[in-house]
């Protein structure tokens, strides 16, 4: 396997970068990542799901996007683990731009006049009630801010842990980075969304706790799947990147 950066150089010298590999699956993963990201954000605006029970006095309820959004962190783990932080950084920015673009398109649809028949059986009020969040400033800013901070936190933590663990204990890296990334993401998203009255402050603790615990739980349960996908990709792509000497500045796109 072509390890782009060898974690244990035989001669003790500084790790060096190998030749750029031909990536066969990378583009597909980008497409799936962006799809999951956009759908989960639309679902977050559309509905709040109630589990129907309480835990330690906290009602178990979360926005519907929470059902799918943890998968984006699994993709983030896979991207950083296999392809390294530098490629993941470009994917995170790609997702950010696509998410902003989808919000812009929904906003344009919202302000365009509705046809008479559509107004009768659906109407502007129904559109705004379900998709208004994705086309209004509050949910858009909350989504973009939470996503950006959370995904970069997740990727940086995983990349640095991979070096510290010398590539061992993948489960520790994926769960550990998710604990940090999801906490930052969830807190920022709920705070900003509540400031813009997307969610009532009365649900703040419930949404933060249930969203965070659910997302981390999904990551833990999906660890065997993550292992299988990571091992398969490393074998197919013939790459296993270690971020020695990487500039972790999110604004450096090279």
Where are the language model's segments positioned?
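Central hydrophobic cores of alpha-helical transmembrane segments in multi-pass inner-membrane proteins
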Residues: 67-78
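Transmembrane helix-bundle signature of multi-pass membrane transporters/permeases
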Residues: 95-96, 144, 148, 171-183, ...
